Amino acid sequence: LKDRQPILRLAAPLALAMVLGMAVNASAGTPSGPRLTEVRSSRVLCRDDVDRARGVDVSVPVTPVSQIAHGRYAVPSTKPKTLVVFDHGYGHTSKSWVEHMKNAARDHGVAAVAVDYRGTHITPDANGDGLPEARGWRVMEGAEDSIAVAQRFLARCKSIKQVVIFGVSMGGNTSGLAVALAKDAKRADGSPLFDYWVDVEGAVNVIETYAGASALAPVNEFAAHAKADIEEEMGGTFDQKPDVYADHAVVNHIGDIKASGVKGVVVVHGLDDGLVPYNQAREMTGLLKEASIPTDMYTIGRKNDAPDKDTSLTGYAGGQLDPNYNSPLAGHASETSQTHIVMVTALDRLWTLIGGQAPGAGNEYIVDGPTGTYP
């Protein structure tokens, strides 16, 4: 979520309510959505000597007519072998990923793209952070958009052989659904569309997220917004549309993720996350392991010495006693950060993944800011 301190203070009790026992699971079939196979779009560059992110429009083949998704991308000066699709979180747009995309292209030689999910309500910057405001939980649309843009780059840039999808927070919901949908969107040679999925502090159980938002909505503006945005995506409340909610929960689609052919998953989550509870990462990791999908789980314990603000459960509790309290434990990072330990760990793991270090058979890692990673 965007770094807005008043919003963060309001958001922390939302996660606290979720941690205190609002998890819900339900069975579901394949996520609803079209068979996404072929995409027409505006021309994209495969190489660029200019250190910038360009705009991109992608046609998404949904019924009754195709729709356009807008986004931004950056490409290196040499032919890229890897594409990274970044899926943004709640309150963010593709603009939050400009610096990450430029770094990816310049420093790692990969093409990088982020899409503004169709249906998201985007308005000008209102808090002075230089980023537009955004409302909407358009995760199924974002999943379709992510598939469409990946297909577009593969069709245009023949040098790309590997595609990694990387989602943060709500983007974990989006990217997980994209991998599930991709079981029906494989490449022409039958290989998986997405080779790897990186799930960073991901909201992979939207039923749990909605339950927490609903509990706090009467007394919490942030929770009320989240509740309303989720209901808009689902077409009603959970009681009215339980099957739709189940269809949008990534944890209900392990079979589809397995069928997509994804080669492995990396899960990164702060132990003291105050927005998306750590239990969602544990649930996701357990299901992936049960399905024999190679998975690396990184639990972030203590923070590093970076000055980034985050949202943590202990930080919220301590802040009730001392407004200046700063928890030593890692909470929910802003996806724009290049120094918070959660984002540093996730991005470092992305680059090593691209470099050839694939996830293992259920590896567990503890990351401690002051002392390092174990084992």
Name these PLM-found stretches.
Residues 11-21:
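Bacterial N-terminal signal peptides
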Residues 208-256:
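Mobile cap/lid helix-loop segments that gate and shape the active-site cleft of serine hydrolases
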Residues 152-156, 160-217:
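Primarily recognizes the serine-hydrolase "nucleophile elbow" in alpha/beta-hydrolase
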Residues 135-157:
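Alpha/beta-hydrolase active-site loop
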Residues 31-76:
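N-terminal cap/lid segment of alpha/beta-hydrolase-fold proteins
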Residues 80, 86-124, 207:
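Short substrate-entry loop that stabilizes the transition state in hydrolases
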